[in-house]
Amino acid sequence: MFVNRWLFSTNHKDIGTLYMIFGAWAGMVGTGLSILIRAELGQPGSLLGDDQIYNVVVTAHAFVMIFFMVMPIMIGGFGNWLVPLMIGAPDMAFPRMNNMSFWLLPPSFLLLLASSMVEAGAGTGWTVYPPLAGNLAHAGASVDLTIFSLHLAGVSSILGAINFITTIINMKPPAITQYQTPLFVWSVMITAVLLLLSLPVLAAGITMLLTDRNLNTTFFDPAGGGDPILYQHLFWFFGHPEVYILILPGFGMISHIVTYYSGKKEPFGYMGMVWAMMSIGFLGFIVWAHHMFTVGMDVDTRAYFTSATMIIAIPTGVKVFSWLATLHGGNIKWSPAMLWALGFIFLFTIGGLTGIVLSNSSLDIVLHDTYYVVAHFHYVLSMGAVFAIMGGFVHWFPLFTGYTLNETWAKIHFTIMFVGVNMTFFPQHFLGLAGMPRRYSDYPDAYTTWNTISSMGSFISLTAVILMIFMIWEALASKRLVKSVPLTSTNLEWIYGCPPPFHTFEEPVFIKST
């Protein structure tokens, strides 16, 4: 019975729960790795040993957080749970493929962990650039295992993407058009399209790297007529859409949370929000080389990528101002989820502004590979994606479990986390402007003060993570049942009960077209 329910599951709610648990577990691993990084950098001098082990930790931290925490929770967890409920579908379009999408992830995670256990580990950075990732600088099986891990995670995401696109297009009741689906459903569909178009390019790039390493091909080796810059183009053609994949479902969740706790029946500018997400998704594919301003591109090429990158700020601004307009005049409830959403809007905007700074190719040549870049993308990931996940989690926790969290503790948790992440990442802007380079385990004494403060901040964040685990335990142990949910007529996922039944519908849905 247990095996049938959890290993062979074809139920979107159970698979969503599995994704959530896996993502939370991987999140603990990723947090542990980040604490190792900040412990090493907390003061000058060496803590872990040499730079190789440090870079293995940095690389693993990135892969774990991106592929095994943010994506499984946002797309696999919230996506599986909410999309069928929001469109009135009985389940996903391909329930068994859905199960396989999940079960590809633990073996993938295992391969990534194995890569750090053999030889010296993969100390390449998450970009895995050759020639550093080639078979001379990284002899041994580590990088090969990492590549296989990425292949599995990629297949999992591609299958999931096919499933979500099919579900959202084909499994709505006939009376509902695409423009009547909630924004979270839109965000997941756009994310799925991005995954479907970008992951095959990554697969091609890392497969060529695999053959360069093991079969004596020279795709990325100038000695045989190859070019390492080709790898960078292939990687970033995936890598840039990937960062939008990480944030788009968060946009969808924030839209729902802000609308709900403003007491509004719909978000401000629904069509504008949809258009903005589609624009961001499209533009995300034509700006990849802004990660490569330092490789020596023509000035006109740099001018194009600078301009195209800046254009992305426009649809992003549409979203930010629409969220603020949704708040305007609303009966605002200062719930924990609302605090996360407001924190998201504020901090994501700061991350976006530093992104505009970096989009200037001339400035980026100075700031590339410094802590300014680290600060920028952690503002949009550690305070964008993670705040969206936390907001979505405390908002929908009663739906998933049928129990309520302690609201006071949830607010305290938000406060600790808010202070921690800002104390960790705000000083890194100063370090970057002062020229401290990324991916080094040690630094000149001049950088000590800000690094020490940054490391203190990371331990405050760790406290928040531990408090969250306790909060979840407390809620599941206390079993405070959900009494009532307001605004269900415009928030369809809540109308089936808390939690909804194992099989949402006993018979096909009928929705009268208006």
Curated annotation (Swiss-Prot):
Keyword list, A-Z: Calcium, Copper, Electron transport, Heme, Iron, Magnesium, Membrane, Metal-binding, Mitochondrion, Mitochondrion inner membrane, Respiratory chain, Sodium, Translocase, Transmembrane, Transmembrane helix, Transport
Sequence ranges on the Mitochondrial matrix membrane side: 1-11, 87-94, 171-182, 262-269, 328-335, 401-406, 479-514
Binding residues for Na(+): E40, G45, S441
Sequence ranges on the Mitochondrial intermembrane membrane side: 41-50, 118-140, 213-227, 287-298, 358-370, 434-446
Residues bound to Fe(II)-heme a: H61, H378
Membrane-spanning residues: 12-40, 51-86, 95-117, 141-170, 183-212, 228-261, 270-286, 299-327, 336-357, 371-400, 407-433, 447-478
Catalytic activity: 4 Fe(II)-[cytochrome c] + O2 + 8 H(+)(in) = 4 Fe(III)-[cytochrome c] + 2 H2O + 4 H(+)(out)
Keyword Transmembrane helix applies: yes
EC id: 7.1.1.9
Top-tier EC class: translocase
Chain sites annotated for binding Mg(2+): H368, D369
Membrane topology: Multi-pass membrane protein
Database matches in InterPro entries: Cyt_c_oxase-like_su1_dom (IPR023616), Cyt_c_oxase-like_su1_sf (IPR036927), Cyt_C_Oxase_1 (IPR000883), Cyt_c_Oxase_su1_BS (IPR023615), Cyt_c_oxase_su1_dom (IPR033944)
Classification via SUPFAM superfamilies: Cytochrome c oxidase subunit I-like
KW Metal-binding (keyword) present: yes
Annotated residues for binding of O2: Y244
Functional pathway: Energy metabolism; oxidative phosphorylation
Molecular function terms from GO: cytochrome-c oxidase activity; heme binding; metal ion binding
Localization terms from the record: Mitochondrion inner membrane
Record's function text: Component of the cytochrome c oxidase, the last enzyme in the mitochondrial electron transport chain which drives oxidative phosphorylation. The respiratory chain contains 3 multisubunit complexes succinate dehydrogenase (complex II, CII), ubiquinol-cytochrome c oxidoreductase (cytochrome b-c1 complex, complex III, CIII) and cytochrome c oxidase (complex IV, CIV), that cooperate to transfer electrons derived from NADH and succinate to molecular oxygen, creating an electrochemical gradient over the inner membrane that drives transmembrane transport and the ATP synthase.
UniProt-listed PANTHER family: CYTOCHROME C OXIDASE SUBUNIT 1
Subunit (UniProt): Component of the cytochrome c oxidase (complex IV, CIV), a multisubunit enzyme composed of 14 subunits. The complex is composed of a catalytic core of 3 subunits MT-CO1, MT-CO2 and MT-CO3, encoded in the mitochondrial DNA, and 11 supernumerary subunits COX4I, COX5A, COX5B, COX6A, COX6B, COX6C, COX7A, COX7B, COX7C, COX8 and NDUFA4, which are encoded in the nuclear genome.
Name this protein carries in UniProt: Cytochrome c oxidase subunit 1
Gene: MT-CO1
